[in-house]
A protein has these predicted regions:
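Basic, polyanion-binding surface patches
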Residues: 1-197
């Protein structure tokens, strides 16, 4: 049974606001790919837009440019080894979905591969062509057109991370195959006003 529920687009950026490592999925014709990306972030609220760094020489970049969109999935700790594996090899040599037995379904808006197993959230992203930033900095911009998240940890536009769901945490790549899970969510309190002087 899937615990995934749609996320309202005004809240979609919150799915990656905390800087998790993500899985980028792409497809064009009969070719498909999945790769890991440590550098992604929201860049605009309305419409929701994201940026992700994907090297121009990668198979993923080729597919997403040809298709005009990509999937962005947030893996949980259970997918840490898989995330490292798909980020360490090229999809030009093998279909990583088949090789690693990754189950994916076409997204509802763009048809890009969406992964829910061992993931916390996903977004379908329509590529916004910015040739200068793509070529000079390998930074790709996209508009989020649909999103969903595991309702056990994301509901009403907010993450709910606590000791009761420690296995349902996003992962953050520290380099060299070392990852850290997201910590417990804590609420900031307003500070009292300061007096001049």
């Amino acid at each position: 049974m899937s615990h995934f529920a749609p996320v309202a687009l005004p809240h979609a950026n919150r799915l990656i606001n905390h800087g998790p490592t993500v899985l980028i999925t792409s497809v064009f014709g009969a070719k498909r790919n999945v790769m890991a990306a440590a550098w992604s972030m929201p860049v605009e609220f309305s419409p929701p837009r994201v940026a992700v760094v994907i090297d121009k020489s990668t198979f993923s970049r080729e597919l997403m440019t040809a298709h005009g969109g990509f999937g962005l999935c947030v893996p949980a700790t259970a997918a840490m080894d898989l995330t490292y594996a798909v980020g360490s090899c090229s999809g030009r040599e093998r279909d990583k979905f088949a090789h690693y037995n990754i189950q994916a379904a076409p997204g509802p808006a763009l048809g890009v591969p969406i992964i829910e197993a061992n993931c916390l959230a996903w977004m379908e992203c329509r590529l916004i062509r910015e040739p200068h930033t793509e070529d000079a900095y390998d930074t790709c911009f996209a508009e989020v057109v649909s999103a969903a998240a595991d309702s056990r940890v994301f509901a009403n536009g907010h993450w709910t991370l606590n000791d009761g769901n420690a296995t349902l945490r996003s992962i953050h790549h520290l380099g060299g195959g070392l990852f850290a899970p997201a910590g417990e969510a804590v609420q900031a309190r307003p500070l009292p006003p300061t007096r001049p002087g």
